[in-house]
Amino acid sequence: MKNGMLALGMTAADVPDNFLWGAASAAYQVEGATNKDGKGRSVWDYYLDEKHLAGPGISGALRLTFTDRDQYLKDIQLFKELGLNSYRFSHRLDTYYPDGQGPVNLRAVAHYRQFITDLEAAGIKPLVTLYHWDMPESLSAAGGWENRESVEWFQRYAEVIFANFSDQVDQFVLINEPTVEVATKIMAEKRLKGEELTLPPIVPAGSYLETSLKSYNHILLASAAAAESFKVKGYKGRLGIALPFFPVLTTENASDEDKADARLVDGILNRWFLDAMYKGNYPADVLKLAADRHLNIDVQPGDAERIHDAGLGFLGINYYAPFFIRHQKNASEVYSPEIIFPKNEKLAFNGAVRPDQFSALLERVRDEYGNPPVIITENGAGFEGEDQLTNGKVNDVNRCLYLVDHIHAMRESIARGANVQGYYVWSSHDNLEWLSGYKSRFGMIYVDYDTQKRTPKLSAEIYGKIIRGENISDVDCKSD
């Protein structure tokens, strides 16, 4: 099923009972209201509103006015009409702790409790993310995730969320996309210095490797600490973490150096997290790489065991595309990977469109990591020039094909025993895509940023039909 082969006979009936069909968003990307209700400043307010790293006039204050109840009630009605039975959204650390450390801002509690009440009134179950990149500016200045004290910062914040929302919410995503957050922040800091990277250093190498591995360890420890607090207090429900996984591939004529680099990239981006969570250790090859380079990654005795023993209740998987890796030509370092984009691959904004690698990922988790409960916390795509509003419609054919083929791939993996319990499209709406600003659209719902008018796209229509149990295939993704 490579590159959009026909998905035959696929219906929502091919998934387990009580399956979660949803869409996802993140607070910073949709809410707007930069200075509303006592909110503090995150590092992203600094990057975009003050330093304009996404371009002139691109401000986080625009967004989708999702803090406006009149507006979000209309959005909830759209979700209901599509047939969603769940919606994933995030809280903001900088809203609850405006200065990163001080008293809790209780106005945030009231807002989100009302939002959850409104979701549930529409029959939509909340999946709540605690942290989606909104590090308070003060904590970022103190080192952010590179600082081991971030474990305690996050644990204290998580305890506030659990205390105020565990009666409304029974599933929490603790942290979203550690590897992508770290890479995007590195890129932002480079841009502040007038330097430009063609791509975020999502495949960490060179000087970025120490920062990345140290941050990854602290993020996993922070998740473990939050889970420990959850258990001590006896809250009911499940905790997970949303991790971006990248199947790592090489080309047919790959050299031994290409394959060696690909193996290490897999270790850094995939096995680093899965091995710690489900085996209680970090990958030996990655630890050796760090030791050989004399890197201070702050992995202390007992760290990986603590992460394993936390026993998170589900694994959140964010899947977009695989990475094709080769060894850089004329590189002086033994480990010198680079991402390539083979010409024969159909490409979305995030890389090659490969639903077969989605299946491979789900079945790898099944076979190598004990088949834990899995929720697909993000899956989606954006395509250059596709999201055009014409005569009141957006015929996003490529996104529609992407979703149909990836849902079909998921269904086939479920039939082969993968323990997948939910699926969330990224994203519900077009939104602010970090350093890309508003030019990269990923939503199933088109947003006119000037008027805030919403228009469901073709992909939303077809996704709704899948949820309702209609028999859908690629041929349904056709424009009028």
From Swiss-Prot:
SUPFAM superfamilies linked to this entry: (Trans)glycosidases
Establish whether keyword Repressor is in the entry: no
What are the cysteine partners in each disulfide bond?
none
PROSITE patterns annotated for this entry?
A: GLYCOSYL_HYDROL_F1_1, GLYCOSYL_HYDROL_F1_2
Pfam families for the chain: Glyco_hydro_1
GO MF annotation: an example: beta-glucosidase activity
The active-site annotation reads: 177 (proton donor), 378 (nucleophile)
GO cellular-component terms in the record?
A: cytosol
Q: Which InterPro entries does this UniProt record tie to the protein? A: Glyco_hydro_1, Glyco_hydro_1_AS, Glyco_hydro_1_N_CS, Glycoside_hydrolase_SF
Q: What is its EC number?
A: 3.2.1.21
Biological-process GO terms, alphabetical: cellulose catabolic process
Which keywords label this protein?
Carbohydrate metabolism, Cellulose degradation, Glycosidase, Hydrolase, Polysaccharide degradation
* Catalytic function, reaction form: Hydrolysis of terminal, non-reducing beta-D-glucosyl residues with release of beta-D-glucose
Q: Which superkingdom heads the taxonomic lineage of this protein's source?
A: Bacteria
Q: Does the keyword NADP apply?
A: no
Family recorded in the similarity comment:
Belongs to the glycosyl hydrolase 1 family.
Protein's recorded name: Beta-glucosidase A
Give the gene that encodes this protein.
bglA
